[in-house]
């Protein structure tokens, strides 16, 4: 995300200021002209016109919210949060920062790090219309598509959880189909041929290939979304389902399968490792080389 945004800003003579809890990660952007802000979110909130954030969980977002409001923030600061968090957390943060004069929107992103690098992310954008109009060019610089989810920021994170439910369900479906094929004499290439012919979309083709190839380890050259992150996100959608009295049976199954992988020490594998749980339940080996 940040590399594409910096490239966009450079074209108009502007620069990106960046911060990361792990400063070495932020420093990678210095080579393309970004400025590393070592003094953290408070300094960014005081000096920047637009602030983007991408944080792991609700606790991290709330902590940054405390720092932004204590800065104090620059007058009319716009903050666009791209994190996957619980909608009530987005609503809470929005109310707090807005009480300090900050204009807040949510635009959580669909896509892994490799998609971000290739500018293939999809954003679920929600906030006041004039704000969205003003910052849309920045978001377009980081995405291939934007889904407009209205004026309430928490609807952006609701959209993200609904979207992630689709993705998690696809992973479970592929895992079960591949296991059934394995046990019934079909080759995994047969499964991939069906996917590529009948269901040619990036999510199903990508995870179908990854699962069929037992390509579950994550590395800098082979990015993915880890089991630990999957548990967090599926946990959020299950919480929202409980709160709204909605049955998400597939989410319950996926959560159980991810928990099994975490218990086996596979927390850093891609969440496509759901297939290992399905295989084990079906009487097949549930291990793969990391």
Where is each model-derived feature located?
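Glycine/threonine-rich flexible loop motifs
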Residues: 55-67
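Glycine-centered short loops/turns at secondary-structure junctions
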Residues: 12-13, 33, 101, 185, ...
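Buried hydrophobic positions in well-ordered alpha/beta secondary-structure cores of metabolic enzymes
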Residues: 1, 29, 48-51, 61, ...
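Rossmann-fold dinucleotide-binding core
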Residues: 84-168
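NAD(P)+-binding Rossmann beta1-loop-alpha1 motif at the extreme N-terminus of oxidoreductases
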Residues: 1-53, 73-78, 83, 92, ...
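Helix N-cap at the beta1-alpha1 junction of Rossmann-like dinucleotide-binding domains, i.e.
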Residues: 23-24, 58, 129
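Helical "substrate-binding/catalytic lid" subdomain
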Residues: 155-281
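Hydrophobic beta-strand scaffold residues
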Residues: 16, 36-37, 103-105, 146, ...
């Amino acid at each position: 995300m940040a590399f594409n945004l910096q490239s966009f800003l450079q074209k108009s003579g502007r620069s990106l200021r960046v911060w990361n809890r792990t400063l070495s990660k932020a420093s990678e952007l210095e080579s393309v002209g970004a400025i590393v802000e070592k003094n953290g979110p408070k300094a960014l909130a005081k000096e920047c016109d637009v602030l983007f954030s991408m944080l792991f969980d609700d606790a991290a977002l709330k902590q940054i919210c405390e720092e932004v409001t204590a800065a104090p923030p620059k007058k009319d600061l716009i903050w666009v949060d791209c994190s996957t968090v619980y909608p009530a957390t987005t609503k809470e943060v929005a109310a707090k920062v807005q009480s300090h004069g900050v204009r807040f929107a949510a635009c959580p992103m669909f896509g892994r790090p490799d998609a971000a690098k290739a500018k293939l992310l999809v954003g679920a954008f929600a906030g006041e219309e004039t704000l969205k109009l003003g910052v849309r060019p920045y978001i377009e610089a980081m995405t291939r598509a934007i889904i407009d989810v209205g004026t309430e920021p928490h609807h952006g994170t609701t959209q993200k959880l609904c979207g992630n439910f689709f993705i998690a369900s696809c992973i479970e479906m592929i895992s079960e189909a591949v296991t059934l094929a394995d046990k019934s004499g079909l080759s995994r290439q047969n499964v991939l041929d069906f996917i590529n012919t009948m269901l040619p979309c990036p999510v199903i083709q990508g995870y179908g290939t990854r699962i069929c190839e037992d390509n579950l380890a994550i590395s800098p050259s082979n990015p993915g979304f880890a089991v630990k992150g999957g548990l967090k996100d599926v946990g959020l959608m299950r919480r929202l389902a409980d709160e709204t009295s909605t049955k998400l049976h597939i989410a319950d199954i996926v959560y159980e399968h991810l928990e099994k992988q975490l218990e086996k020490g596979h927390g850093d594998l891609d969440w496509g490792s759901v297939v290992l749980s399905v295989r084990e339940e079906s009487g097949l080996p549930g291990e793969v080389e990391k």
